[in-house]
From Swiss-Prot:
TM regions (residue ranges): 5-25, 41-61, 82-102, 120-140, 155-175, 203-223
Annotated function: Transmembrane reductase that uses ascorbate as an electron donor in the cytoplasm and transfers electrons across membranes to reduce iron cations Fe(3+) into Fe(2+) in the lumen of the late endosome and lysosome. Reduced iron can then be extruded from the late endosome and lysosome to the cytoplasm by divalent metal-specific transporters. It is therefore most probably involved in endosomal and lysosomal cellular iron homeostasis.
Binding site for heme b 1: 47, 112-115, 117, 177
Organism: Mus musculus (Mouse)
Encoding gene (name): Cyb561a3
Lumenal-side positions: 26-40, 103-119, 176-202
Cytoplasmic topological domain residue ranges: 1-4, 62-81, 141-154, 224-242
Designated name of the protein: Lysosomal membrane ascorbate-dependent ferrireductase CYB561A3
Domain Cytochrome b561: 12-219
Lineage: Eukaryota, Metazoa, Chordata, Craniata, Vertebrata
Gene Ontology biological-process annotations: intracellular iron ion homeostasis
Catalytic activity: Fe(3+)(out) + L-ascorbate(in) = monodehydro-L-ascorbate radical(in) + Fe(2+)(out) + H(+)
C-alpha cells in the first residue's frame, strides 16, 4: 500500500512539474513576447523557464531517484548514474539560464546581482555546484574512505533538501520581482491583479506545491531506501559489482 501511495505521489509530482514548466513558458510567450537569443528582453525570457526546469523540477526529480522502490534491489549503478545525470542536466539548464540573464543585463546596461532575488539565486547555484562536485568526488570516485562517506552522507542529504528549498524561494522571489518591474507602469498595476499577475502568482503556487511534495516524499521514513549495511555503503560507484 505504501508503494501505491508512493507511485501516486510520483504521478502527482510529474503533473505538477510539467505544469510548472509549461505555465512559466506560457507566461513568457503570451505576456512577455516570446523567446530569442539576442541579448534583448526576449533572451531574458529563457531565464525563468530554464531555472524552473533545472533548479526545481529536474533537481526535485533527481532527489527522488533513491526513493523509487525498484532502486532498492539489484545493481545500484544504474540508479547512481541516473541520480548524477539528472543533477547534471539540472545544472546545465541552470547555467544556460544564468547566461541568458547576464547577457540581457549586459545588453541593457543593467547592474548585476543587486537584488535579494539575485543574491538568493546565485547562492543556491554555488551551493548546487559544490554539492554536485563533492558528491561526485566522494561517492563516485574510489579514493574516499568509508569513514568519510559515512560522515558526509547526512550532510549531502541535508544540503540537497536545503538547495531545493532555496531554489523554490529564489523562484518565488523572482516571479514577484518580475511582476513588480513589468506591471509598474502598466495600465493595470499589480495591485489590481490583472490576468498576468493572477497567472504568474498561480505559477508560483504550483512551484511551491511541487517543492513541498518533493520534500514530503524525501522526509517520509517509510519511503526511504533501506540501509543495505556497512559493506555496501563503503563500495564506491566505480567498484560496484552488485
Amino acid at each position: 500500500m505504501a508503494s501505491g501511495w508512493f507511485y501516486l505521489s510520483c504521478m502527482v509530482l510529474g503533473s505538477l512539474g510539467s505544469m510548472c514548466i509549461l505555465f512559466t513558458a506560457y507566461w513568457m510567450q503570451y505576456w512577455r513576447g516570446g523567446f530569442a537569443w539576442d541579448g534583448t528582453v526576449l533572451m531574458f525570457n529563457w531565464h525563468p523557464v530554464l531555472m524552473v526546469a533545472g533548479m526545481v523540477v529536474l533537481y526535485g526529480a533527481a532527489s527522488l531517484v533513491y526513493r523509487l522502490p525498484s532502486s532498492w534491489v539489484g545493481p545500484r549503478l544504474p540508479w547512481k548514474v541516473l541520480h548524477a545525470a539528472l543533477h547534471l542536466l539540472a545544472f546545465t539548464c541552470t547555467v544556460v539560464g544564468l547566461i541568458a540573464v547576464f547577457r540581457f543585463h549586459n545588453h541593457s546596461r543593467i547592474a548585476h546581482l543587486y537584488s535579494l532575488h539575485s543574491w538568493l539565486g546565485i547562492t543556491t547555484v554555488v551551493l548546487f555546484a559544490c554539492q554536485w562536485f563533492l558528491g561526485f568526488a566522494v561517492f563516485l570516485l574510489p579514493w574516499a574512505s568509508q569513514w568519510l562517506r559515512s560522515l558526509l552522507k547526512p550532510l549531502h542529504v541535508f544540503f540537497g533538501a536545503c538547495i531545493l528549498s532555496l531554489s523554490i524561494t529564489s523562484v518565488i522571489s523572482g516571479i514577484n520581482e518580475k511582476l513588480f518591474f513589468v506591471l509598474k507602469n502598466a495600465t493595470k498595476p499589480y495591485s489590481s491583479l490583472p490576468g498576468e499577475a493572477v497567472f504568474a502568482n498561480s505559477t508560483g503556487l504550483l512551484v511551491v506545491a511541487f517543492g513541498l511534495l518533493v520534500l514530503y516524499v524525501l522526509l517520509a521514513s517509510s519511503w526511504k531506501r533501506p540501509d543495505p549495511g556497512a559493506l555496501t555503503d563503503r563500495q564506491p560507484l566505480l567498484h560496484d559489482r552488485e
